[in-house]
């Protein structure tokens, strides 16, 4: 569930929570960060922590990409200051005794926002819309493929011969998605319990393709939720020895995911 800092403090002191994920989104929309002990979070990390500034300049495989002014071998790959946004604290039911808080990235001085950080880019866009008299509201409809194999199996097979969880188009098909309900039910309920207002899941237009729909909210909150939904789907799939992909087009022979 979404909880306040005071609620988190109580849960840490009572040992209901012992780990706090302090994270932000990289340029690929993935959660990156640290697992912080509850004690350290309460003592000082709730105010600030530090991440390497290369996190906004890596590729999909986490290799550093040359040519960036903000982060490079020449500049020594320094740290940026990450200040946890206490409005984003959530308890994560699918991870034992774990909470999450997203952070805003600042330069090492702790005062200047990292201009190219994902949350800052969105904050500036929202501010421009507000000046024009608009309040951006967003709702996520994520599509993804669910596979029978685990991530390890898929990797060891060099990402060939992937086996979707169903064998014919399952768009709106109840029987097809009933076979996948062990995964989808946990995903829906876990996200709902974490404070993300999930409306539904359904089959989509290809074998093994899933869709999850989330009720709209303000743009920044939805962007934060969108990242967490993807991460939760991957982690819950892993628990069930399955795998998911949100790739726009993982296979040229089947339809893509939006």
Please give the residue ranges for each predicted region:
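ATP/Mg2+-dependent ligation/transfer catalytic cores
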Residues: 1-200, 222, 228
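Active-site-proximal loop/short-helix segments
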Residues: 147-164, 197-217, 248-258
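Acidic, glycine-rich loop-and-beta core segments that form the ion-binding/anion-interacting portion
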Residues: 209, 214, 222-258
């Amino acid at each position: 569930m979404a909880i306040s800092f005071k609620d988190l403090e109580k849960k840490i002191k009572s040992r209901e929570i012992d780990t706090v994920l302090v994270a932000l989104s990289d340029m690929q929309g993935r959660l990156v960060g640290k697992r912080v002990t509850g004690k350290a979070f309460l003592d000082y990390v709730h105010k600030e922590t530090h991440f390497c500034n290369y996190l906004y300049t890596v590729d999909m495989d986490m290799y550093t990409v040359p040519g960036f002014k903000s982060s490079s071998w020449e500049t020594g790959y320094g740290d940026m200051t990450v200040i946890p946004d206490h409005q984003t604290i959530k308890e994560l039911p699918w991870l034992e005794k774990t909470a999450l808080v997203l952070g805003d990235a600042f330069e090492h001085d702790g005062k200047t926002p990292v201009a190219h950080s994902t949350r800052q880019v969105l904050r500036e866009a929202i501010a421009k819309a507000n000046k024009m008299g608009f309040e951006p509201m967003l709702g996520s409809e994520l599509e993804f493929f669910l596979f029978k194999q685990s991530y390890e199996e898929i990797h060891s097979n060099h990402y060939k011969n992937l086996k979707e969880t169903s064998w014919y188009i399952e768009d709106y098909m109840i029987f097809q998605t009933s076979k996948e309900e062990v995964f989808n039910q946990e995903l829906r309920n876990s996200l709902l319990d974490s404070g993300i207002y999930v409306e539904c899941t359904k089959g989509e237009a290809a074998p093994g393709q899933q869709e999850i729909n989330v009720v709209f909210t303000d743009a920044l909150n939805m962007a934060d939720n969108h990242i967490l939904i993807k991460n939760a789907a991957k982690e819950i799939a892993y628990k069930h020895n399955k795998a998911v992909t949100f790739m726009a087009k993982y296979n040229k022979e089947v339809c893509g995911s939006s």
